[in-house]
């Protein structure tokens, strides 16, 4: 079986899909919301599960069943339209929904900041308002038209202020302010009883007001009689005594002609009828009051006869003053003189109005009374006086306000929600005239006003359709030119510039990815394949469905309803509402809950939308793509397997059979060369029934087939190792005891998982890279990790220990002497000697005094390390193992470990080690020590009482006394127990098997001082020990610590786990990509001292495992340094192993500060060290003075000046590192400090102070990942040694993950504690352990402890001054003599002394320093060094050893990004974070391409333009220089250059699109940044990796706009797309290596059997 791999996927691109693309993915349109038919359970046609669209539900069978079977594959059934294929298609084939109205994609609308908002330049809130058909709350004045003049307005029609302002610009008409009526009281009732009078009048807006007057009246009645002549008219005013009717003389009536008389008594009239022969007509006379006829009825009369008598009518006088009112019965007739004559008796009243009310009613009111009607108080006059929301002018309003006070309210301004629209098209002239432009948002009232004035020259719309029009109208090229032009005018740091740059970036991204902006508005929605959103039948016949189906259903329902509404020509408002609902439905399908309230199911649980399927821990990325399940695996409890070799494990038979089933089956079939189905069945049965032959085959297969064992939590790579399985009975996996430390396993019920590597390549990797015998050395620190412990150590110690009298026994007194080791063995076997008896043995021609136990142990040790006079405890065994590994390699070491294990277990058993309480001897010294301490404490108390000590000092002294006493008791106890070397407790502690001196002290000495809950030490110690027992008080004091310990452990585990996740995330892509990046930079090797002066790391540890960046010169000879023992030369690229590190770390020589010398100018040679002129000379009038540095230029000038010799002063110490502190003899000022690189100024200061010589070491520059210049990852040389095998690291090694694991794995051992150093407020709390590590990795701005001060210069502490307020100031004099002042905050203490020398970055006070401050004031190297020291210190304090290079990788990632200050001519924005190497590369490319500008200008002539050219001309106008497809001429080129166009995109002869730069570009200006690890992992190059970390939708949105390509450089990205990671054997350079599994030949198989 051969296996190779090729990388299938080179990159993954994400883009915005166009409607055409969405439809091209689809196999059909989903038109119905139905899913499955409830009767047949078959998918509904055109529904969400339609077989025609998505493929058949049964394999190779159409829906109607006409075609069945694979032979019809590809046939489309003509009955049901289903294509015959595998049901797998239902996981692949997509559908789509064609939307009736466009819908905005919520990701682009609601990203933060919103992409559509930035692109269109419309604020996000307003944009959302447009999309969701929102309104705008407007308060505006009301105006009413009073004179329309020549317009189409009607008198009385109302306008709002905004409309009026628009109309009045073009039209002439008059308006007055108006009000709107609110809550008028109804109905109108009369407040008095009285008579009704009704009248009508018109207002100035031609609207009618009806007046109802009600009057309450007092009346004087006067009777009037026929014939009376009235002096007054109805309504006239009279005074009392006025004559209404004057006295009048009535003459008799005479007959006018001959005739007959008729008297009518009822009407009081007399009629004369003429004779029938006469032509006269009858005449009637009314008889006035008091006139009587003188003739009888029917009498005949002659002309002139008297008919009546004459009389006098009396005068009628007004009895009261008042108003005249004619009674209803009064009948009058007007006369020519204007007076009235009474025709019939009646009544006249003189009225006085007692009370009168007027009720104006607006047109439209319903009146319930009639004119003249008498009504009572409370009667209803009309249903209302005004309508709700009636508009009135101010004058009209005043009438009603006067007559109906407090019966209604009126508003002169109205607050309304006006629907808004966005302008999508506007004529240029209209735009200039109105000041509006495309994209402006106005209310629909304003829009219709503009439409009236300008017609179709202006168009506006709302909803997604409007956004789509706006996006379609965008000319991106023009927009780009406009933004670039505007950017030149604003300051780069302003907020406006940032907005413009964001917009410019989006425009450029859209152009680059060839995305049309309108694609962000959806016309069609893809429907995911049905098997990804299944519907399953649950018991009870109900169906359970994925949330997506519900969300799709809502979209289809609303879409179909909208379609119907369009067909029915529904009103605009209903259609708008339906469009809004469709938009919301699509929003919740894409990202439920992003806009407004989330759609929930009946239990109130939000439905999971497409976005929810991607993001978060449970999303597609982290759940399925990065967290896959593993096939061929099992897990079981582990038990110890002491008989195993280190590379073996015991695998339970049953488990092995299950895991290797396919292999066993294949082998069984292979044996008999059978392939038939029945044969398979038979062989399967053999396996299932567990017949012996199955196990025989299994035994054979398992040989040489490694398995992987893994124990969770997998904190580092040693938690997953390969073993060769051995079949065992039982159900538990057997584990070799020596691999317990790397797995952190014990046998108290731990479980482990087993995995089977399948392919030949995987097996090879497991066998050669992961086998446990190759993982003895830890990659964290390069020392062994698979180490014997517990009983093995105790056994080996017991074997090699001696009696206490061993050393004092003289050789002549030794009873047993042997000629050989074998002979001693015989004596032991026969019982003559015991293991620990002193014996003399001849070994290698020498007689040595030893014990038989030591002889046994020496037999397994390599020859070079045999030692017959050594007791082997844990430390000695560790050294032995490490030395064996260094000398003989990993295989011999593994064998040695197995031998140690076997011996250890055997002799631990023989030793019969037991523990009893009586084994804890209590030292007689103990009481004395305690008594002395008590006496000292009493003294202190007395001094305190007398006032010689402060409370703080007393506390500190007491603590100190008891701490010393405890230590003395500890030593005394150990010494006392050790008097009997066979004391089991002493054996356990001294060997390092279990327990330590501290625990022994507590058991048999005294428990000592305890801490209280805050961590402050309690000054009363526990004097008792556990053997004697504690008093109640002592027991109580000791509980604090125990509780705190338990709480800490629980908190630590989770914090450490999260720290590891962040570390891995930030460093995962750091892989060794090349053997050598070629850099000459490096870091200076130095002793690491933390800010408080603690030595964190010795020089030899700093050097171990690194590669030299420069040659190391011997300070004495100035030649390359040579190791005298090994003869190794320390030149560039030498890898420093353990022995080299020890040599270089301890090598130093004493050399003179200055020597005199001279240069022979006849054959000049410059000295190796720095030198200066010791005499003056002049050449060409230039004076070369004493003290000038001598270089070749000076030598040449001296030769030309005719000198033969040149006297010089040589300073050999310059460039060397001092290993001592040199003080001035005058004022004991520090001239040079330990580990200081001596510079010229320092050397001269030494010379001035008459210092003759200094002890120095060479300056050693080593390669470091911090200075590596590899484009991606790091190079082998900068990384140095792979600590797990002590070889230079291989290309492909995943050093980032190893670093993260090495730092994260011991995280749980770091304490959480924040110690008090004893003081309450005076000394700072020191944050330690995990919180401090996190504080540093996260580069916290806010530190838990007070901030310290550091020096920014190299110099001396001149003075330390304290002012009255207690503030201290430190003055530092630099080497140039300038003074620098540093103020020390009150909360911290000064950490330097007067005369002390300080170096840049050195702490001047206690307290922590912010790394960012160091970066700002010093440089990157100082920051990296500070971080390294401080992080390393956290681990060193807890006794955890981790190599610097691991921390350096994390620090490199934290310092890897730079912040763009000025993007120059690149697409970055100010504030963008970019990798340093990327910026350097881009700047280099810009500078290189700037050189080619002239040649490009020639090349571009005659080529065809791919884009039209647009730029801003001198007048600030955007102009088009050339059209797309036009040929570039000299003229066009000249114009383009003049207007500042820097790139031309053209088509060359073959039609390829090429970009030519025609103007020089500006490079990026940047500043270095220190990022916290969380931020550093988010700031990734690839979008896949970033999307899978946090903020998935945001990352994908931005990536799609950009058309981002992920080149799959990191590890996570490749895991996501499912191919090998580019690390280790997954690197491209190993891609074509063929791994063959050679078949074993028959003879070989027989041998093995």
From Swiss-Prot:
CDD domains associated with the record: RNAP_beta'_C, RNAP_beta'_N
Signal peptide stretch: none
Cofactors, names only: Mg(2+); Zn(2+)
Binding site for Zn(2+) 1: 62, 64, 77, 80
Cofactor descriptive note: Binds 1 Mg(2+) ion per subunit. Binds 2 Zn(2+) ions per subunit.
Residues annotated as binding Mg(2+): 746, 748, 750
Residue positions binding Zn(2+) 2: 1077, 1268, 1275, 1278
InterPro entries on file: DNA-dir_RpoC_beta_prime, DNA-dir_RpoC_beta_prime_bact, RNA_pol_asu, RNA_pol_N, RNA_pol_Rpb1_1, RNA_pol_Rpb1_3, RNA_pol_Rpb1_3_sf, RNA_pol_Rpb1_4
Keywords: DNA-directed RNA polymerase, Magnesium, Metal-binding, Nucleotidyltransferase, Transcription, Transferase, Zinc
A biological process from GO: DNA-templated transcription
Catalytically driven reaction(s): RNA(n) + a ribonucleoside 5'-triphosphate = RNA(n+1) + diphosphate
Enzyme class: transferase
Keyword Nucleotidyltransferase assigned: yes
Gene Ontology molecular function: DNA binding; DNA-directed RNA polymerase activity; magnesium ion binding; zinc ion binding
Function as written in the Swiss-Prot or TrEMBL entry: DNA-dependent RNA polymerase catalyzes the transcription of DNA into RNA using the four ribonucleoside triphosphates as substrates.
Family matches, as HAMAP family: RNApol_bact_RpoC (MF_01322)
Similarity section: Belongs to the RNA polymerase beta' chain family.
Subunit structure of this chain's protein: The RNAP catalytic core consists of 2 alpha, 1 beta, 1 beta' and 1 omega subunit. When a sigma factor is associated with the core the holoenzyme is formed, which can initiate transcription.
Protein's name according to its UniProt entry: DNA-directed RNA polymerase subunit beta'
Encoding gene (name): rpoC
